[in-house]
C-alpha cells in the first residue's frame, strides 16, 4: 500500500492508474478506523480496480472546537488496518496541504442540509462539502463510499455532486454495529464504562419503535423514542425526527412516503452519538 502526504503525489498515482484504464474507488475517512470503515474499504476493493482511502480530520466541518481537539487520531494504526484490508493507497495530508489558504466557498446544498444536523451544527455540512469536493477533484473517483450511519451526510454529498456536476457515483453502505447493537463510531472510544453499557439502548429503542408504526403516528413514535431514551441514565436526546428518506423533510403520516427514516442524535455523557432506522415495510 502506498501512503501519500501531498496532493501532487496523490494526483500522480491517480493519473498513472487512469492511464492504465483502471477504475478508482474513494473512501473518505477522518481516521480512528473501525470495522465500519473497513466494510467500506472491502466494498471499494471488490467493485473497483484501485481503492484510495483518505485519513484527514477536517477542521472546517467542526463547529465545536473542543470536539475537534478531542477527535481521536491514530494514523499509524489506521495505515496498518488499511494495508491489511488490501487498500491500494491512502492519502494522509496535513491541514496546510488540503487548505493552503482558507476555503471561502459556500455551497447551496438545499433543504437536505438545513434540517437535523444542519440545524444543530451550523456550518457543518458546508465544511463537509468543502473537503469532499476537494478530495473528489484530487482523486476523480468513479465511485465514493460512505456509511449510512451518517444518513443525512450522504444526502448532502449527493446534493453537492449534482450541484457541481461531478461524474462520481455515491455508494451508500449499511451501518455496521457492535454485537450489542451500538452503531460503530470513532467517537465510541470516548465513552466511559457506564456510558458504553447504556449506549446500545439507542439502537434497542429505535428497533422497538418499529413495532409502534402500525397503530401510531410518526409524531407519537417520535415522542415515545425521545421520552424512552431521556428516561435512561447518561442519555439526552438532541433530536429525533422521522423524515422522508430522500427529501429529509419531516413526515406527518406514514403514507407521506414509502421511505421513512428515523434519524437521531443522542448525547451519551459528553459524547455525541448518531444513528438511524428505516421504517420501510
UniProtKB/Swiss-Prot annotation:
ATP binds at residues 30-37, 147-150, 176, 184-187. Its EC number is 6.3.2.1. It comes from the Bacteria. GO terms for biological process: pantothenate biosynthetic process. Gene3D superfamilies: HUPs, Pantoate-beta-alanine ligase, C-terminal domain. It catalyses: (R)-pantoate + beta-alanine + ATP = (R)-pantothenate + AMP + diphosphate + H(+). Coiled coil: none annotated. CDD domains: PanC. It is an enzyme of class 6 (ligase). The active site is at residue 37. (R)-pantoate binds at residues 61, 153. It is found in: Cytoplasm. GO terms for cellular component: cytosol. InterPro entries: Pantoate_ligase, Pantoate_ligase_C, Rossmann-like_a/b/a_fold. Belongs to the pantothenate synthetase family. This is Pantothenate synthetase. It comes from Porphyromonas gingivalis (strain ATCC BAA-308 / W83).
